[in-house]
From Swiss-Prot:
GO terms for molecular function: actin filament binding; ATP binding; ATP hydrolysis activity; calmodulin binding; microfilament motor activity. Belongs to the TRAFAC class myosin-kinesin ATPase superfamily. Myosin family. Keywords: Actin-binding, ATP-binding, Calmodulin-binding, Coiled coil, Cytoplasm, Methylation, Motor protein, Muscle protein, Myosin, Nucleotide-binding, Thick filament. Residues 782-811 form the IQ domain. Muscle myosin is a hexameric protein that consists of 2 heavy chain subunits (MHC), 2 alkali light chain subunits (MLC) and 2 regulatory light chain subunits (MLC-2). The rodlike tail sequence is highly repetitive, showing cycles of a 28-residue repeat pattern composed of 4 heptapeptides, characteristic for alpha-helical coiled coils. Limited proteolysis of myosin heavy chain produces 1 light meromyosin (LMM) and 1 heavy meromyosin (HMM). HMM can be further cleaved into 2 globular subfragments (S1) and 1 rod-shaped subfragment (S2). Muscle contraction. Residues 1269-1282 have a biased composition (Polar residues). This is Myosin-3.
Length: 1940
């Protein structure tokens, strides 16, 4: 996700392309609950957002955003993605992929005006219905060169990706923009073209042609669109600018990616719109643009008004469109015409014909009086139309009303009715407009064809979208059928081809059927007996009607095809005749007028006028139209065979098939356009409409396959070349390694997710997004490498600069040292004296030197003048020599050119041979096609003959029925006469009979009409029959011509015999296949043994599982027994509770009997009773809960037992299947053994053939190798001789120049001797020069002799090699003489045939067709001969096929095993889930039990309070000492009972704990069983994978062997052909070499003769010199004078000689230095390589260290995550401990409250006791005072005392019971405290574990720091080593420079 700064590139378009960073952060911070937030199905909006409130009983309650509450099924609720995925750019990245998620993502982006969204591999765009600033130039620049993931979704991104793919993959691309009508396809097409015209612009304005208005190629491509839209777009119900034609725009690019040219193909222009529009539509834009009066000159030119309602053709619907400005559009259209280079005449004709179409609609006709014929109703409109079309108006009206029709061989004028004339006018208008449109497209293509070299193209497809109107006709069917085919192409490319590619490349893939096959609807329309076929068939019959067409459709398809339905009748809607179920919906079609539309008839008389029109454009449009009244022999030329049957539907299907074939040859990119609503409202989205389009277009399926599959793939070689930079060390240098292995090593060494790619046979496949990651890694790596390289270069440059600075520094030091030394001695006296004397010492010498210098100057001046004269002469000689040299070079060049021409001719002959062979193949293929066509024609002929016979039978039947009718007529007439005579009064019967007569007459007339129609039909069929018979005659004549060429084909028979040899070689291939099959059989035996062992393992595993199940069942029984014991204890405790309750009731009754209880005691008793009732209720609830838990536990145990039983059954079934497979494998092994026996028998037969063929192959290879060696020797000798010849020629030229120079110099010397005797010394000098030249010439002669001898030796060697080659050639010729002769003859004949073809192409085609037919016959005859030889081959192939079939069956078995394993694993996972749910329920039970314990504690506290109160009461009655002993006994008894109850309670708790332990043991055993099963499954998966790999390897080896044999066979054939060609070339080269050798020998002889001549001249010169010596005495004085000059010249000569020697010495020194530098360079290169290896080692060590550091970082991260997890666990434990602490505090608070209540009760009891004691004391005193006197009162007091005693006993008993309860509760409190302590201890242990993890984390962090330190140390070492290497290299450089 790019930042806001990166989005600034797009300018104002940025908010419309991608969310800002602020929005992204806000989305991430939004509150979101994944469990409650959801999408839910809604009846109105399809899907709405909501929150889950509750879920129970299979229903989910959801509250929607608009506060509605919905109760739906769980499957109607869909998960919602987190807010960070809102407005995601690629919907393939969504976490939850479902329909509502995709819908709301598109909706959210659409509301933010982000109309482009990626959907996996393609792009989805939603029509915004308004202008958005997302197509500006800065947006184009922003997308240029960007990868898909680097920029937001856009049509420009798709375009740029297609452009980049074209450049990198060198493959044609296509962009398919599809969608329903009004979805925005045309706009996106324009933007694509705009983008290509911008980024690939040539920028060469100089390419503009003559017209000033014409623009560049980019301008013309862009301008083509407005012109096409003006003439081809119109307003429809759904779209204001709907394309009413389809176009495929191909933009061609050159090798550099620049625009080269473009062309446009159009499909299916909707012609009917010219004359008819619906109410809410209008015609084509151009009519309304012209009428906008923006260009008034057009109104005058076309003779029209500005009111559209004046023209019925264009005013049937709407006139104005709010979103289109017709006036501005007219200017754009006119400008586009100019830019596209239309001439003024063409432009005028374009407008005129458009205006004429409008005028056609105003032409009126009326019916003649008393006739049905039509006549013109006024001629004004016809005059205008004729003027615009360049016609005569009267001729036009006559042709319309009275056209000429051909009847037989004569032409008849036929009268037309008014309706017929109107139909003709409409047809002509549509035809003119259509042809005008097609001409315009052709003219645009001519202009866009720049003839520049072009390599690849990108095609942009824009067709009319899917349409469902109220009235749908043939045009809508064609449009919808085209969209159906394109959708099928998309489905096939996205879902079928993609998965087939995975299978073909050997990638593990389970085929997914997305259910997107549209073949049923397509076949219904285009297959034989489909809709188009029936339509074309009906068009052939003259009396066919739309009704008969409809009836045929119903008979053929209604009820037989699900896609063909009868339409429902809807009131107010146009009548429909049938319905088709398309991919985008069901469409009702009306067949009205389909036959006429399909036949498309024209008034041929008017067309003839068009062809003679003065309007050149109109005449050009109809120049190729064939009419029946064409002149003379033009008929055959103008009209091809069968063109009369070319219907609109047939032409449409042909164009559509061509388009689909074009698309299949390109790499497609899909853009899906979506309509958001039907009202064209910006920003509004109808959910149902958008969902319908998404489902039809396969958007969700495309995303799914993009996520599951591997959408990106690269060839291994390309991947290695492009991404090797990521880790170059992974691929070793200097040794060959397979590209696949290299890619595997490379990817394994990169830090990526290794599950995101797969290796195929030829390509590596990537998941979506991984290739982008690799590209980013590559960019980063390249950036690092470039910066590293820059750093090294800059460092090197700075070091060089530093060395220069050091040299300058040393020089400065030297200068400074000398200057300082001079400054020190400057003022020394002796030095001053030296400065003064030194000039004086040299003054005398200088004078002498000056005099000598003057003399020398004069001498040198004279010598200079002489040398200048000599130099001029030598320059003249040099010019002549250069001219001679150039002449020789021209001769040599001419010879070399001749040689090259000969070689080129040889190459051309070879190429011509190959071309002829290819043409022969093409001809044979075409012959096969012609034979197929011939067979089809004969079948059609037979069919037509059958139909003719049937028609004749029908005619005979009709004649018989006619005769019968005549007889019946006569009979009825006689009856009528008799009845009138006999029954004159019966008028009613007479009337009845007359009515019957009339009916019979009508039937008779009808039969006569039918008979006439059948006769017409028979006539047409007879014409067709005659035509077909003519074709048959032509074919028979061509067959006779083929028989003549049969002699040529007999020669090809020998070629086929050579193919027999190839077939024998294929037998060798089959031998190898047999060996491989043997190996596969062995492998299958081994695999069978492995499977047996696996079956045994499975049996043992099933036995173990059965044992475990039995053990588990025993444990379950034990648990049930324990539960029964628990119930018994519960019953016992319940019984005790009831006893206690009964005793308590008795005590209460006794207390009620006691009368003296105080009010406080009564209140306490009530309070105790209420508390007791509360305790009873709590206890009952606890028992109920306990029983519920026991029931659930029992149920879960039963479920687990049932699951285990099911697992046993599954294992039993698996066992049975394994046994079945075992038996099947045994049968397969038997079959394989039988096949092996048959193969072994065939092997014995094939071995003999194999041996013979191997011997022949080895001989051929040996000879081939010898030939190649000899050829290589000859080529080397040839090259050496050529170089030697060139050297000799150069030396000869030099010698000739020297000789000529010597001769000229000799003549000059003789003249000088005769004329000027004083130049004797110069002659001596010339003599010396001649002597030197003589020596050099002799040396050169020696060299020439040596070279000549070497050349003679080379010639001898060459002759020997030539003789050897000739002998080998003779051998080859004897061996292949017949083949060579045959080939030469074939070549000569092919040349003749080629010349004949070039002269007459039509004759060539016929000859080739005939030849192909005879070829096919001979081929069939020879194939019959070959079949006998191929019996063994077919047998072996059948065996291989059987083995392959068995292998496929085995693969199926393996797949079934895998599915079974997956099912068992799923069942195991379900069992594990159930066990987890059991454990959670057990945990809930524990919580419930703890809550019950809490309630028991509260009850215990209350009992304790009661016990305290009872204790107070006992203290009150303690004064009565008599009952203390009894109370003590009862107390002991109560304690015993309390102990029993306590023991029972402890036993219950122990039983519960025992149950918990057992459950834990069961869970552990379940986990063990799960792990065991997982291990077994993993082992099985590994074994299955091993089997798959073994089979894959065997298949690969077999395929590789087969490919190798095929390659070797092809290589042998190629070598054979190459050797034959090389032999011819060698012969030609030998002849050239012989000629050159003869020429060089002649040249040498001439040179030797010249050398002899020069020798004679030299002898003469010596003799002349001797004569001159005799004359020396005479010229002695002259010699003395000239002696000084000679000496001076000699000195200068010596000086020049010394300079020459010095230069030579310097040259030698420089060569030595070069050698030294070369050696130093090589040593430096070696050291550099060594250092580079060291550096790579160091880099690898650094990378290892970095890897270790990364591993340490990962460990640290892992430790951090572990610490975080432990911290979370600690937090949880702390929370639980805090909860327990809170519970503890609550318990303590309740204890305090109870203690407080107990104190209060004690105080109350004490107060009441004191009062009673005081009363008793007063009573005792009263009794003591009145003891004697009142006996009665004494007895009463004794009774009262006894009552009190009973009451005390009861109270003491109750107090003991309460005390026991209190003690029991106290024990429970103690246990709870123990548990609290244990929880505290667990919390402390958790703290300790957290501390331990923290220490581990600190330790890991410490290790990480140490690893980082080690990495830093390693990096510093690397830097040191680098510094050392730099120092070493710099020192070597310094040493090297010092040596220099």
């Amino acid at each position: 996700m790019s930042s806001d700064t990166e989005m600034e590139v797009f300018g104002i378009a940025a908010p419309f392309l991608r969310k800002s960073e602020k929005e992204r952060i806000e989305a991430q911070n939004q509150p979101f609950d994944a469990k409650t937030y959801c999408f839910v199905v809604d009846s109105k909006e399809e899907y709405v957002k909501g929150k889950i409130k509750s879920s129970q009983d299979g229903k989910v309650t959801v509250e929607t955003e608009d506060s509605r509450t919905l109760v739906v099924k769980p499957e109607d609720v869909y998960a919602m993605n987190p807010p960070k995925f809102d407005k995601i750019e690629d919907m393939a990245m969504l976490t939850h992929l479902n329909e509502p998620a995709v819908l709301y993502n598109l909706k959210d982006r659409y509301t933010s005006w982000m109309i482009y969204t990626y959907s996996g591999l393609f792009c989805v765009t939603v029509n915004p219905y308004k202008w958005l600033p997302v197509y500006n130039p800065e947006v184009v620049d922003g997308y240029r060169g960007k990868k898909r993931q680097e920029a937001p979704p856009h049509i420009f991104s798709i375009s740029d990706n297609a452009y980049q793919f074209m450049l990198t993959d060198r493959e044609n691309q296509s962009i398919l923009i599809t969608g329903e009508s009004g979805a925005g396809k045309t706009v996106n097409t324009k933007r694509v073209i705009q983008y290509f015209a911008t980024i690939a612009a040539t920028g060469d304005l100089a390419k503009k042609k003559d017209s000033k208005m014409k623009g560049t190629l980019e301008d013309q491509i862009i301008s083509a669109n407005p012109l096409l839209e003006a003439f081809g777009n119109a307003k429809t119900v759904r779209n204001d600018n709907s394309s009413r034609f389809g176009k495929f725009i191909r933009i061609h690019f050159g090798t550099t990616g620049k625009l080269a040219s473009a062309d446009i193909e159009t499909y299916l222009l909707e012609k009917s719109r010219v004359t008819f529009q619906l109410k809410a539509e209008r015609s084509y834009h151009i009519f309304y643009q012209i009428l906008s009066n923006k260009k008034p000159e057009l109104i005058e030119l076309l003779l029209i008004t500005t009111n559209p309602y004046d023209y019925p053709f264009i005013s049937q619907g709407e006139i104005l469109v709010a979103s289109i400005d017709d006036a501005e559009e007219l200017l754009a259209t006119d400008s586009a015409i100019d830019i596209l280079g239309f001439t003024p005449e063409e432009k005028s004709g374009l407008y005129k014909l458009t205006g004429a179409v409008m005028h056609y609609g105003n032409m009126k006709f009326k019916q003649k009086q008393r006739e049905e014929q039509a006549e013109p109703d006024g001629t004004e409109v016809a005059d205008k139309t004729a003027y615009l079309m360049g016609l005569n108006s009267s001729d036009l009206l006559k042709a319309l009303c009275f056209p000429r029709v051909k009847v037989g061989n004569e032409y008849v004028t036929k009268g037309q009715t008014v309706d017929q004339v109107h139909h003709a006018v409409n047809a002509l208008s549509k035809s003119v407009y259509e042809k005008l449109f097609l001409w315009m497209v052709t003219r645009i293509n001519q202009q866009l064809d720049t003839k520049l070299p072009r390599q690849h193209f990108i095609g942009v497809l824009d067709i009319a979208g899917f349409e469902i109107f109220e009235y749908n006709s043939l045009e809508q069917l064609c449009i919808n059928f085209t969209n159906e085919k394109l959708q099928q192409f998309f489905n096939h490319h996205m879902f079928v081809l993609e998965q087939e590619e995975y299978k073909k490349e050997g990638i593990e893939w389970t085929f997914i059927d997305f259910g997107m096959d549209l073949a049923a609807c397509i076949e219904l329309i285009e297959k034989p007996m489909g809709i188009f076929s029936i339509l074309e068939e009906e068009c052939m019959f003259p009396k066919a009607t739309d009704t008969s067409f409809k009836n045929k459709l119903y008979d053929q398809h209604l009820g037989k095809s699900n896609n063909f339905q009868k339409p429902k009748v809807v009131k107010g809607k146009a009548e429909a005749h049938f319905s088709l179920v398309h991919y985008a919906g069901t469409v009702d079609y009306s067949v009205s007028g389909w036959l006429e539309k399909n036949k498309d008839p024209l008034n041929e008389t008017v067309v003839g006028l068009y062809q003679k029109s003065s309007n050149r454009l109109l005449a050009h449009l109809y120049a190729t139209f064939a009419t029946t009244d064409a002149d003379g022999g033009k008929k055959k030329v103008a009209k091809k065979k069968g063109s009369s049957f070319q219907t609109v539907s047939a032409l449409f299907r042909e164009n559509l098939n061509k388009l689909m074939s074009n698309l299949r040859t390109t790499h497609p990119h899909f853009v899906r356009c979506i309509i958001p609503n039907e009202t064209k409202t910006p920003g509004a989205m109808e959910h149902s409409l958008v969902l319908h389009q998404l489902r039809c277009n396969g958007v969700l399926e495309g995303i799914r396959i993009c996520r599951k599959g591997f959408p990106n793939r690269i060839l291994y070689g390309d991947f290695k070349q492009r991404y090797r930079v990521l880790n170059a060390s992974a691929i070793p240098e200097g040794q060959f390694i397979d590209s696949k292995k290299a890619c595997e090593k490379l990817l394994a060494s990169i830090d990526i997710d290794h599950t995101q790619y797969k290796f195929g046979h030829t390509k590596v496949f990537f998941k979506a997004g991984l290739l982008g990651t690799l590209e980013e890694m590559r960019d980063e790596r390249l950036a690092k490498l470039i910066t590293r390289t820059q750093a090294v270069c800059r460092g090197f440059l700075m070091r060089v600069e530093f060395q220069k600075m050091m040299q300058r520094r040393e020089s400065i030091f030297c200068i400074q040292y000398n200057i300082r030394a001079f400054m020190n001695v400057k003022h020394w006296p002796w030095m001053k004296l030296f400065f003064k004397i030194k000039p004086l010492l040299k003054s005398a010498e200088t004078e002498k030197e000056m005099a000598t210098m003057k003399e020398e100057f004069q001498k040198t001046k004279d010598e200079l003048a002489k040398s200048e004269a000599k130099r001029k002469e030598l320059e003249e000689k040099l010019v002549t020599l250069v001219q001679e040299k150039n002449d020789l070079q021209l001769q040599v060049q001419a010879e070399s050119e001749n040689l090259l021409d000969a070689e080129e001719r040889c190459d051309q002959l070879i190429k011509a041979k190959f071309q002829l062979e290819a043409k022969i193949k093409e001809v044979t293929e075409r012959a096969e096609d012609e034979e197929e066509i011939n067979a089809e024609l004969t079948a059609k002929k037979r069919k037509l003959e059958d139909e003719c016979s049937e028609l004749k039978k029908d005619i005979d039947d009709l004649e018989l029925t006619l005769a019968k009718v005549e007889k019946e007529k006569h009979a009825t007439e006689n009856k009528v006469k008799n009845l009138t005579e006999e029954l004159a009064g019966l008028d009613e019967t007479i009337a009845k009979l007359t009515r019957e007569k009339k009916a019979l007459q009508e039937a008779h007339q009808q039969t006569l009409d039918d008979l006439q129609a059948e006769e017409d039909k028979v006539n047409s069929l007879s014409k067709l029959k005659s035509k077909l018979e003519q074709q048959v005659d032509d074919l028979e004549s061509s067959l006779e011509q083929e028989k003549k060429l049969r002699v040529d084909l007999e020669r090809n028979k020998r070629k086929l015999e050579g193919d027999l040899k190839l077939a024998q070689e294929s037998i060798l291939d089959l031998e190898n296949d047999k060996q491989q099959l043997d190996e596969r059989l062995k492998k299958k035996d081994f695999e069978y043994s492995q499977l047996q062992s696996k079956v045994e393992d499975e049996q043992t595993l099933s036995l173990q599982l059965q044992k475990k199940i039995k053990e588990l069942q025993a444990r379950i029984e034990e648990l049930e027994e324990e539960i029964e014991a628990e119930r018994a204890t519960r019953a016992k405790t319940e019984k005790q509770r009831s006893d206690y309750a009964r005793e308590l009731e008795e005590l209460s009754e006794r207390l009620e009997e006691a009368g003296g209880v105080t009010s406080t005691q009564i209140e306490l008793n009530k309070k105790r009773e209420a508390e007791f009732l509360k305790l009873r209720r709590d206890l009952e609830e606890a028992t109920l809960q306990h029983e519920a838990t026991v029931a659930t536990l029992r149920k879960k145990h039963a479920d687990s037992a049932a699951e285990l039983a099911e697992q046993i059954d599954n294992l039993q079934r698996v066992k049975q299947k394994l046994e079945k497979e075992k038996s099947e494998f045994k049968l397969e092994i038997d079959d394989l053994s039988s096949s092996v026996e048959s193969v072994s028998k065939s092997k014995a037969n094939l071995e003999k053939i194999c041996r013979t063929l191997e011997d022949q192959l080895s001989e051929a290879r040996g000879k081939n190798e010898e030939m190649q060696r000899s050829l290589s020797e000859l080529t080397t000798q040839k090259s050496r001789l050529q170089t030697e010849a060139g050297e000799l020629s150069r030396q000869l030229e030099e010698k000739e120049s020297i000789v000529s120079q010597l001769s000229r110099s000799k003549q000059a010397f003789t003249q000088q001797i005769e004329e000027l005797k004083r130049q004797l010394e110069e002659e001596n000098k010339a003599k010396n020069a001649l002597a030197h030249a003589l020596q050099s010439s002799r040396h050169d002669c020696d060299l020439l002799r040596e070279q000549y001898e070497e050349e003679q030796e080379g010639k001898a060697e060459l002759q020997r090699a030539l003789s050897k080659a000739n002998s080998e050639v003779a051998q080859w010729r004897t061996k292949y003489e017949t083949d060579a002769i045959q080939r030469t003859e074939e070549l000569e004949e092919a040349k003749k045939k080629l010349a004949q073809r070039l002269q007459d192409s039509e004759e060539q085609v016929e000859a080739v067709n005939a030849k192909c037919a005879s070829l096919e016959k001979t081929k069939q005859r020879l194939q019959g001969e070959v079949e006998d030889l191929m019996v063994d081959v077919e047998r072996a192939n059948s065996l291989a096929a059987a083995l392959d079939k068995k292998q496929r069956n085995f693969d199926k078995v393996l797949a079934e095993w895998k599915t079974k394993c997956e099912e068992s694993q799923a069942e195991l996972e379900a069992a594990l889930k159930e066990s987890r749910s059991l454990s959670t329920e057990l945990f809930k039970l524990k919580n419930a039990y703890e809550e019950a314990l809490d309630q028991l504690e509260t009850v215990k506290r209350e009992n304790k309070n009661l016990e305290q109160e009872i204790a107070d009461l006992t203290e009150q009655i303690a004064e009565n000492g008599k009952s203390i002993h009894e109370l003590e006994k009862s107390r002991k008894q109560m304690e015993l009972e309390k102990a029993d109850i306590q023991m029972a309670l402890e036993e219950a708790e122990a039983a519960l704990e025992h149950e918990e332990a057992k459950i834990l043991r069961i869970q552990l055993e379940l986990t063990q069983v799960k792990s065991e099963i997982d291990r077994k499954i993993a082992e099985k998966d590994e074994e299955i994978e091993q089997l798959k790999r073994n089979y894959q390897r065997t298949v690969e080896t077999m395929q590789g062997a087969l490919d190798a044999e095929v390659r070797s066979r092809n290589e042998a054939i190629r070598l054979k052909k190459k050797m034959e060609g090389d032999l011819n070339e060698i012969e030609i080269q030998l002849s050239h070499a012989n000629r050159q050798a003869a020429e060089t020998i002649k040249h040498l002889r001439s040179v030797q003769g010249q050398l002899k001549d020069t020798q004679l001249h030299l002898d003469d010169a010596l003799r002349g010199q001797e004569d001159l010596k005799e004359q020396l005495a005479i010229v002695e004085r002259r010699a003395n004078l000239l002696q000084a000059e000679v000496e001076e010249l000699r000195a200068t000569l010596e000086q020049t000689e010394r300079a020459r020697k010095l230069a030579e010495q310097e040259l030698l020194d420089s060569n030595e230095r070069v050698q030294l530098l070369h050696t130093q360079n090589t040593s430096l290169i070696h050291t550099k390589k060594k250092l580079e290896t060291d550096l790579t080692q160091l880099q690898s060590e650094v990378e290892d260290a970095c890897r270790d550091a990364r591993n340490a970082e990962e460990k640290a991260k892992k430790a951090i995550t572990d610490a975080a997890m432990m911290a979370e666990e600690l937090k949880k434990e702390q929370d639980t401990s805090a909860h327990l602490e809170r519970m503890k505090k609550n318990l303590e608070q309740t204890v305090k409250d109870l203690q407080h209540r107990l104190d209060e009760a004690e105080q109350l009891a004490l107060k009441g006791g004191k009062k009673q004691i005081q009363k008793l004391e007063t009573r005792i005193r009263e009794l003591e005072f009145e003891l004697e006197g009142e006996q009665k009162r004494n007895t009463e007091s004794v009774k009262g005392l006894r009552k009190y005693e009973r009451r005390v006993k009861e109270l003491t008993y109750q107090s003991e019971e309460d005390r026991k309860n209190v003690l029991r509760l106290q024990d429970l409190v103690d246990k709870l405290q123990v548990k609290v302590k244990s929880y505290k201890r667990q919390a402390e242990e958790a703290d300790e574990q957290a501390n331990a993890h923290l220490t581990k984390f600190r330790k890991a962090q410490h290790e990480l720091e140490e690893a980082e330190e080690r990495a830093d140390i390693a990096e510093s070492q690397v830097n040191k080593l680098r510094a050392k290497t730099r120092d070493f290299t710099s020192s070597r450089m310094v040493v090297h420079e010092s040596e220099e």
